[in-house]
Design a protein with these regions (language model features):
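A short, exposed helix-loop element centered on a Lys and neighboring polar residues
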Residues: 120-121, 178
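A glycine-rich helix->loop->beta "capping" turn
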Residues: 2, 50-56, 76-89, 95-100
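Catalytic loop of short-chain dehydrogenase/reductase
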Residues: 92-99, 106, 128-187, 195-210, ...
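The beta1-alpha1 cofactor-binding region of Rossmann-like NAD(H)/NADP(H)-dependent oxidoreductases
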Residues: 37, 60-75
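C-terminal helical subdomain
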Residues: 169, 193, 216-255, 262-268, ...
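Canonical Rossmann dinucleotide-binding motif of NAD(H)/NADP(H)-dependent dehydrogenases/reductases
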Residues: 1-35
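N-terminal Rossmann-like NAD(P) cofactor-binding module of classical short-chain dehydrogenase/reductase
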Residues: 7-8, 85-88, 92, 109, ...
């Protein structure tokens, strides 16, 4: 049996790096995606060591805050990987201030939602080719209490509060997963998302002194990246996860997300807005 091919974004630190290493250790063919070439190489080398040559480990460099880079990455993946079994949409960040990318999108929206939405759209046929592809997206319990304004996804007309914006992006991840499952029903693709727990990682480096202080105080209660990556690895490889289409998972168990995250009308509206924003 050939090794499953798994593409992981945000794979140069934290959950993504830990998942890449564990997937390689389990015999998967891993494709590491990150913005920094040196860090991509570092993760890839760690994965190669863990896999002990059982399967190749590939390196891809892309800035996923830019949709142009997402398109370039997708073209590169399609060119280099004749088969793709799992797309792990793991890249994400929280920002304390509102930044607009060179393409005109608020940075949190661009990285946390539009990038995985577009990358999935561009790789969807390859994932479905063998009738068993999986899309695993890193969400968060931060979605709880978040609401979504389809007329202001960019937070252009509202106060920019880091946790609110981040939580909204995680709500989008769950709605995206739900709608993707609906739209790909019968294709063989399984779409899931998960909460990794509060993980000790470099995630908060863009998040301001107050947020970093809170993480420092919570230090003894934080999970290791390896523990945080466990659900990602399980959803990517375990046969039992193939039947969990459209679900939200916490600690390898299906959980019910917020009411907003279960709103199918909202999910469809977000999908349509996302198609317009990405020209997908």
């Amino acid at each position: 049996m050939s090794s499953p091919v798994v593409l992981i974004t945000g794979a140069t630190r934290g959950i993504g790096a830990a998942a890449a290493v564990e997937l390689a250790r389990r015999g998967a063919e891993v494709a590491v995606v990150g913005r920094d070439a040196a860090r991509v190489r570092e993760t890839a080398e760690a994965a190669r060591a863990a896999g002990d040559g059982a399967a190749p480990v590939h390196e891809h460099v892309a800035d996923l805050t830019l949709l142009g880079d997402v398109r370039r990455l997708a073209a590169e993946v399609l060119d280099r990987h004749p088969r793709l079994d799992v797309l792990a949409n793991n890249a994400g960040a929280m920002f304390t201030a509102r930044h607009v990318t060179a393409e005109g999108h608020e940075e949190t929206l661009a990285l946390n939602h539009l990038a995985p939405f577009l990358l999935t759209a561009l790789l969807r046929e390859r994932l479905a080719a063998d009738g068993g592809g999986r899309v695993v997206t890193t969400a968060s319990t931060a979605h709880t209490g978040a609401s979504l304004d389809l007329d202001d996804l960019e937070f252009a007309g509202r106060p920019f509060k880091a946790m609110t914006v981040y939580g909204t992006s995680k709500l989008m991840n769950i709605l995206f997963t739900r709608e993707l499952a609906r739209r790909t029903a019968g294709s063989g693709i399984t779409a899931t998302c998960f909460h990794p727990g509060v993980v000790r990682t470099g995630f908060g480096k863009n998040d301001g002194l107050l947020y970093r202080a809170a993480l420092t105080a919570a230090g003894p209660f934080l999970r290791s990246p390896a523990r945080g990556a466990r659900s990602l690895v399980w959803l990517a490889l375990d046969p039992a996860a193939a039947g969990l289409d459209g679900t939200y998972v916490v600690d390898e168990r299906v959980r019910e997300p917020s009411a907003a995250a279960r709103d199918d009308v909202l999910a469809e509206g977000l999908w349509e807005r996302s198609e317009a924003l990405t020209a997908a």
